[in-house]
């Protein structure tokens, strides 16, 4: 199974494994930024254009840190840690935001930086929501760029 996943990464423009996924793919525990960088380098060598090891959960520090490697340079995408249970969908939203920015002509790293900012804002806007039990959603609409929100029927 691991080989099948690595085969998918090999053809990816951008791969965004979280800590658990990256740990399984490289075959060892990832528990700090140095290990995140090492995993990003190892997974990028498989053939992906850019690998971003996402460190949002479990929390490593007072920041939400993602480590990106494109074969040339390591980038640390940092945002203040937001204490909230409303983080459901952050990984999918991050990947979708990267894809949207790539479609608009951004480089992979530019897209990742913009996506990190978007998801952080979406988490912040939903931080105090209380919807049901367990993990709640992030505020996708509120975090969207103003020009996109104006196109909504509500004009929000």
Regions found by a protein language model. Name each.
Residues 24, 85-108:
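Short, small-residue alpha-helix embedded
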Residues 30, 77, 138:
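Short clusters of hydrophobic/aromatic residues that line enzyme substrate/ligand-binding pockets
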Residues 74-75, 101-115:
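Phosphate-handling active-site elements
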Residues 1-73:
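Conserved phosphate/ATP/ADP-binding segment of small-molecule kinases
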Residues 21, 56-59, 80-83, 116-119:
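Glycine-rich beta-alpha junction loops
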Residues 109-156:
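Charged C-terminal helix
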Residues 74-88:
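Short pre-catalytic strand/loop immediately N-terminal to key active-site residues, enriched for Gly-Thr
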């Amino acid at each position: 199974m691991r080989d099948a996943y690595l085969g998918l990464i090999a053809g990816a423009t951008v791969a965004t494994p979280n800590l658990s996924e990256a740990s399984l793919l490289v075959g060892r525990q990832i528990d700090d930024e140095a290990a995140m960088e090492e995993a990003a380098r190892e997974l990028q060598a498989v053939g992906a254009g850019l690998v971003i090891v996402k460190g949002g959960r479990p929390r490593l520090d007072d920041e939400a840190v993602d480590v990106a490697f494109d074969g040339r340079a390591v980038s640390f995408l940092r945002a203040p840690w937001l204490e909230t249970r409303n983080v459901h969908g952050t990984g999918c939203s991050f990947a979708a935001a990267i894809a949207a920015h790539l479609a608009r002509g951004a480089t992979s790293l530019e897209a990742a930086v913009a996506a990190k900012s978007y998801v952080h804002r979406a988490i912040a806007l939903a931080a105090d929501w209380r919807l049901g039990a367990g993990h709640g959603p992030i505020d996708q609409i509120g975090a969207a760029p103003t020009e996109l929100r104006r196109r909504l029927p509500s004009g929000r």
